[in-house]
């Protein structure tokens, strides 16, 4: 029998030669991009790697990390802008990337109809969500201006976004030469440039948004308590999504504090030195890049090896093994006391939350296998809708849109960029559309929006459409009530543009269904719910932003208020604690024991909700306890304030527990009416008070004085009656206006400048009737005026005029007080009008005084030609007559009548 093995071997050789020949013919090396190398720009799914063009039909991917997706492909387009990537992009390879990659390397072949001259961008693309996980730019493409930017652009030549080419490949800020695993959730990356004298360090951790990542060098030759006198850099992501990296120096294991000009604790270098030329030189850490993606915080910064700051920074020998320290913990945001992000004690277990090791920067280390995978990958803001508060929909620039690529303009709800919107079944949701007439808002089942029929896809529209568009001056209202058949996941978008909105989560009924009333507290950052049943009240409060604790208080301000604080311990157990606060320091926060039932505290993606039920009037055996005075009267407006912070405890409170954000003013909650108003808004009753005071001090009382000064020439006692009527009417209106203000404010405090001037003016005005009743008698005809009468006349005039002057000043201080409460934009016009009125009054008085002096001169001239029996001559004089006294009604009776003289013939 013949042996067939030689023939089989020959066939295999021919087949291999044929495959090699065919491949060689298809994969030529004519493209100018051959050999082009670039690093992937990370946008989502922790994508990292190096891209290299091999030949005309393939490319190599090395050191490739990526979290898995649903239907991920290699994608191509001419540029990285939204329209090109979304509408003109296409699949360039048969390979699918649906699994997780861990430091992988492989060759990718292009489809037969794809050539390099058709590509400017190669992307890792998820088809169902039109998501760009990351991409590289080829030499004929530039980065789109609308691409996601998580930090200011780097000035480094080694890490520079933008155009890439063969001679200067793109260096991604997320790529490093070395990586060390510090814990399961924390990694250290670095790239050394010893020639230029610096090291680039990247800190990466699956940690909370308000947490810090710290790394630095321990004090040389230190063997114990390595944190003390260490030179560290504290990094993290701010609340607005942008990174920070600051030099810190540790003098004590405590939060930074400055007392009597001396800084102690974990403080920035700049705190130890004044912020001058010296202060600016001590912070030599340079932030290069930072982002927060998929629940992973990443910050890259540059540190010089030999720092000019020898006081707080240690020199680093790149070839020597030195002790370094690291930590993870909660960050304390800036507040009214300090302007820095300060780390709080990390706590936890060594090697998980903190640790130390020996590091030689020159050693090559690669301990990081695959990307970090966070349990909670979504940090987007959450808006929880209810039936009583409309959701304001506007359009604004894209800063942190969660699903790149995206258009340059996206939707905002209640001033938050593309938040996740949570609605409850059975609860109507009201939208106020103010995004412009080119943005038609709608709720759809399609992930991308923008009218799915244009992409040959079907969608179900649940609310809105082409007609739901509006502007600020003329908003369009849309009411949508999800029902039990509404799917759990929907999307809000513009019908004319894809990917402007984000997700709508539909859940079963919650707080809005459980409580009869709800209002937004100051700045719309906390929602307050309540239901009154019998002699008890059930209360709930929900924050609208992520925080470590949520506090609400009953009172005008935190001082002298009763506080309810919802927080979580280290085990994740929620608590609601009660306190009486009688000062501004931590020692002024006193725990109380209130009779609360149905207490709950929960957190959903960092949004805290607290609930409890308490009696309206506490039943106390010891009435001297503070909580016994914490009574709620449903018929009286309840003043409610709020605060949020990073960390709370039921133990000894310190400055680290201070709130990071708080209400600016209390809100008056009308418990029986189910409504609320800002405590400092101009109330109608106070508006009436202001008008009445202007009528009295600006018109009636000055008019009474002018009548006594310039109407003496009227025959009879007409001027006196006008004077009396105006003064009495003005004084009556002053008292009515005062009663209105006292009743509305439940009394008044003399701490206000307005109250001081107003009360002084009222006292002076009240002295005038008493002064008039005590006036001395007029001297007889021909007699000299007495000293008592003269003193009375002067005092009556001076007190009256002083009262009007002080009253006008009180009007202006009232306007200033109104501006402090409501903002200057509401008061500037009123101040201008009041000033104009005072100016016109001054001009009028000047004119009347000029006329009076002219009339007086004419009268004096006519007296030399006095005709006997001329009854038409008016001999009335000024307020002060020739005898130095004031003329009153008695003078008019005596001098205003006809004089009879009997003439007898001379003999």
Swiss-Prot record:
Heme b 2 binds at residues 723, 796. It is found in: Membrane. Disulfide bonds: none annotated. Heme b 1 binds at residues 689, 754. SMART domains: B561, DM13, DoH. Residues 31-139 form the DM13 domain. Binds 2 heme b groups non-covalently. Residues 153-168 have a biased composition (Polar residues). One of its GO terms (molecular function) is metal ion binding. Its main location: membrane. Residues 144-172, 884-907 are annotated as: Disordered. DOMON domain could bind catecholamines and thereby could regulate the cytochrome b561 domain function. DOMON domain could bind one heme b. This is Cytochrome b561, DM13 and DOMON domain-containing protein At5g54830. The lineage of its organism: Eukaryota, Viridiplantae, Streptophyta, Embryophyta, Tracheophyta.
């Amino acid at each position: 029998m013949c042996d067939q093995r030689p023939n089989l071997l020959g066939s295999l050789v021919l087949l291999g030669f044929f495959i090699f020949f065919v491949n060689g013919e298809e994969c030529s090396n004519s493209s100018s991009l051959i050999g082009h190398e670039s690093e992937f720009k990370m946008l989502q799914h922790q994508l990292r790697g190096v891209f290299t063009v091999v030949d005309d039909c393939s490319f190599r991917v090395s050191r490739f990390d990526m979290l898995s997706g649903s239907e991920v492909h290699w994608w191509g387009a001419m540029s990285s802008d939204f329209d090109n990537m979304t509408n003109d992009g296409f699949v360039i390879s048969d390979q699918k990337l649906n699994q997780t990659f861990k430091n992988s390397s492989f060759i990718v072949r292009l489809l037969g109809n794809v050539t390099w001259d058709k590509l400017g961008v190669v992307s890792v693309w998820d088809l169902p969500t039109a998501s760009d996980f990351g991409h590289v730019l080829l030499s004929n493409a530039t980065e789109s201006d609308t691409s996601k930017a998580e930090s200011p652009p780097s000035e480094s030549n080694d890490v520079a976004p933008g155009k890439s080419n063969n001679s200067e490949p793109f260096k991604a800020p997320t790529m490093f030469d070395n990586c060390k695993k510090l814990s399961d959730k924390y990694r250290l990356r670095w790239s050394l440039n010893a020639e230029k004298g610096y090291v680039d360090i990247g800190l990466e951790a699956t940690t909370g948004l308000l947490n810090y990542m710290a790394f630095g060098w321990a004090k040389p030759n230190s063997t114990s308590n390595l944190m003390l006198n260490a030179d560290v850099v504290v990094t993290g992501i701010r609340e607005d999504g942008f990174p920070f990296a600051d030099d810190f120096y540790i003098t004590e294991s405590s939060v930074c504090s400055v007392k009597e000009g001396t800084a102690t604790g974990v403080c920035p270098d700049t705190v130890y030195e004044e912020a001058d030329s010296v202060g600016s030189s001590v912070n030599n850490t340079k932030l290069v890049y930072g982002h927060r993606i998929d629940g992973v915080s990443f910050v890259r910064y540059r540190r010089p090896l030999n720092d000019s700051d020898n006081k707080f920074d240690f020199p680093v020998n790149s070839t020597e093994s030195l002790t370094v320290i690291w930590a993870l913990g909660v960050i304390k945001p800036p507040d009214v006391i300090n302007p820095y992000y300060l780390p709080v004690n990390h706590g936890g277990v060594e090697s998980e939350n903190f640790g130390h090791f020996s590091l030689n920067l020159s050693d090559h280390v690669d301990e990081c296998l695959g990307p970090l995978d966070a349990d909670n990958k979504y940090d987007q803001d959450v808006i929880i809708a209810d039936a009583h508060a409309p959701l304001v929909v506007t359009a604004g620039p894209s800063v942190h849109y969660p699903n790149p690529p995206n258009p340059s303009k996206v939707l905002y709800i209640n001033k938050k960029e593309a938040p996740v919107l949570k609605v409850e079944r059975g609860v109507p949701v009201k939208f106020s559309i103010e995004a412009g007439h080119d943005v038609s808002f709608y709720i759809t089942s399609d992930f991308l929006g923008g009218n799915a029929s244009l992409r040959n896809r079907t969608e179900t529209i649940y609310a809105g459409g082409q007609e739901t568009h509006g502007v600020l001056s003329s908003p369009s209202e849309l009411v949508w009530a999800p029902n039990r058949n509404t799917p759990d996941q929907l999307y809000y978008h513009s019908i004319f543009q894809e990917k402007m909105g984000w997700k709508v989560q539909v859940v079963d009924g919650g707080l809005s269904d459980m409580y009869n009333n709800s209002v937004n507290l100051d700045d719309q950052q906390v929602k307050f719910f309540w239901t009154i049943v019998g002699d008890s009240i059930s209360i709930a409060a929900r924050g609208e932003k992520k925080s470590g604790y949520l506090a609400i208080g009953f009172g005008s301000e935190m001082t002298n208020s009763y506080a309810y604080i919802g927080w979580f311990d280290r085990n994740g157990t929620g608590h609601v604690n009660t306190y009486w606060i009688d000062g501004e320091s931590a020692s002024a926060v006193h725990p109380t024991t209130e009779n609360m039932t149905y207490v709950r505290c929960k957190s959903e993606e960092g949004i805290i909700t607290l609930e409890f039920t308490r009696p309206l009037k506490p039943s106390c055996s010891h009435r001297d306890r503070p909580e016994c005075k914490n009574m709620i009267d449903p018929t009286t407006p309840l003043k409610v304030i709020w605060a949020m912070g990073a960390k709370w405890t039921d133990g000894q409170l310190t400055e680290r527990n201070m709130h990071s954000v708080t209400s600016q003013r209390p809100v008056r909650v009308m418990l029986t009416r189910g409504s609320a108003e800002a405590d400092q808004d101009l109330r109608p009753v106070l508006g009436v008070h202001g008008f009445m005071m202007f009528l009295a001090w600006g018109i009636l009382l000055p008019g009474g004085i002018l009548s006594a000064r310039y109407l003496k020439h009227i025959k009879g006692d007409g001027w006196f009656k006008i004077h009396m009527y105006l003064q009495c009417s003005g004084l009556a209106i002053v008292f009515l206006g005062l009663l209105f203000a006292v009743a509305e404010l439940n009394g008044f405090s003399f701490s206000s400048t307005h109250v001081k001037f107003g009360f002084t003016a009222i006292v002076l005005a009240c002295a005038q009737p008493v002064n008039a009743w005590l006036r001395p008698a007029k001297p007889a005809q021909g007699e000299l005026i007495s000293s008592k009468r003269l003193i009375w006349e002067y005092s009556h005039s001076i007190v009256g005029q002083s009262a009007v002057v002080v009253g006008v000043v009180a009007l202006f201080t009232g306007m200033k007080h109104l501006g402090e409460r409501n903002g200057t934009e509401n008061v500037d016009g009123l101040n201008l009008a009041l000033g104009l009125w005072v100016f016109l009054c001054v001009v009028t008085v000047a004119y009347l005084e000029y006329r009076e002096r002219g009339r007086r001169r004419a009268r004096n001239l006519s007296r030399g030609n006095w005709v006997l029996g001329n009854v038409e001559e008016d001999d009335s004089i000024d307020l002060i007559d020739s005898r130095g006294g004031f003329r009153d009604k008695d003078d008019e009776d005596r001098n205003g009548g006809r004089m009879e003289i009997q003439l007898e013939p001379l003999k």
